[in-house]
Design a protein with these regions (language model features):
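Generic secondary-structure signature for well-ordered alpha-helical cores
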Residues: 83, 152-155, 161-168, 176-188, ...
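ATP/NTP phosphate-donor binding region
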Residues: 1-91
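Residue-level signal for inorganic ion chemistry
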Residues: 17, 36, 70, 121, ...
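Short glycine/serine/threonine-rich phosphate/pyrophosphate-binding segments
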Residues: 99-106, 127-128, 239-240
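A glycine/threonine-rich phosphate-anchoring loop and its flanking beta-alpha core
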Residues: 15, 29, 106-196
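Active-site segments that bind and position negatively charged phosphate/pyrophosphate groups
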Residues: 192-290
């Protein structure tokens, strides 16, 4: 299956099929120097499958975890690109989850003012969301995605076979992003996630439908000037929770926690039940006082306020300018 992201000169395909990694040479332009970036939590054969099809390559394996999305790791990748004598005709390939894609994409965006970038996501979260859209970033001083750029990939290669290696927790994390898109854009997708007798068997359809939503939103708003902010549903509180939790919670788990307060009170029990069905947390110990400093540093904030995404009915959304204090009031009242 091919899903196109139509952005004029920056258009690219999302190639979605079982066994796609074994056919990477057919789909990606790899007859050049390629820095293949992965992490220690990804089976090494995935990166090798890409590297073996390159004219010249170097695999850079980072420690797994958000801690690698740092300035130090960014500098490491740039140095590896220099050692490989890469020029503007060469490329970077990210093989891994969201951390790898964000970091490798940012290195590609800034090395020699930009080189080609291929995203080969190996987690469900990255497959349904972060691999598409060109957002790249690193964290700085505990602030998530504080430094970044928009840099669209040349292609996204999704091999659904790799999902077999994920833990139940990693699968649940990815489902959080699909729930986010369903809540804001597709009520029937929400019903599928809510009622499917076998969520694992339904994953290919969930991935494809999530990607179509993401592609349509990115096409209309590639640099997040308006509509694309809908994809931040759950993320304003979610990023604050992620920073507050200090690595104990995964990104998708924090998004799940951040969605419930931002939907209408009558909808919260249904959303909570869906998240629990997916294996996601719906409670954590972060207090409003602990979350406030991180909300104040939210990159989406302007003049002391944030444009928050709210959901009153599944498949719909509205945006409202809110202060951090107003958002935290929703956090405190989420179970009311």
């Amino acid at each position: 299956m091919v899903i196109s992201v139509s952005l004029g000169a920056q258009s690219y395909p999302i190639l979605l099929e079982p066994g796609a990694l074994t056919r990477a040479g057919e789909h990606l332009s790899l007859d050049r120097r390629v820095l293949v970036v992965t992490d220690s939590g990804v089976p090494q054969e995935y990166a090798q499958a890409i590297a073996s099809r390159c004219r010249q390559s170097r695999i850079c394996t980072l420690p797994a975890g958000e801690g690698s999305k740092s300035m130090d790791s960014y500098h490491l990748l740039l140095r590896e690109m220099l050692r490989l004598h890469m020029d503007r005709g060469d490329c970077v390939a990210a093989v891994g989850g969201g951390m790898v894609g964000d970091l490798a994409g940012f290195a590609a965006a800034t090395y020699m003012r930009g080189v080609d970038f291929y995203n080969i996501p190996t987690t469900l979260l990255a497959q349904v969301d972060s691999s598409v859209g060109g957002k790249t970033a690193i964290d700085l001083d505990g602030v998530k995605n504080a430094v970044g750029a928009f840099h669209q990939p040349r292609a996204v290669l999704i091999d659904t076979d790799v999902l077999r290696t994920l833990s139940p927790r990693q699968t649940a994390e990815g489902l959080a992003e699909s729930v986010k898109m369903a809540m804001t854009c597709d009520a029937s997708l929400l019903s599928l996630i809510e009622t499917a007798s076998d969520l694992t068997a339904a994953l290919p359809e969930i991935i494809a439908r999530s990607l179509r939503i993401k592609a349509q939103v990115v096409e209309q708003d590639p640099t997040e000037q308006g509509l694309r902010r809908v994809l931040n549903f759950g993320h304003t509180l979610g990023h604050a929770i992620e920073s507050c939790a200090g690595g104990e919670l995964l990104h998708g788990e924090c998004v799940a926690l951040g969605m419930v307060p931002m939907c209408a009170p009558p909808l919260r029990p249904r959303l909570t039940a869906i998240l629990q069905r997916c294996g996601l947390p719906t409670e954590c110990g972060c207090t409003a006082g602990q979350l406030l400093p991180y909300l104040l540093h939210d990159k989406k904030a302007a003049s002391g306020s944030v444009t928050a995404v709210l959901v009153d009915e599944p498949g719909t959304f509205r945006m409202e300018t809110m202060t951090p204090e107003e958002i935290l009031r929703r956090w405190e009242e989420r179970n009311a």
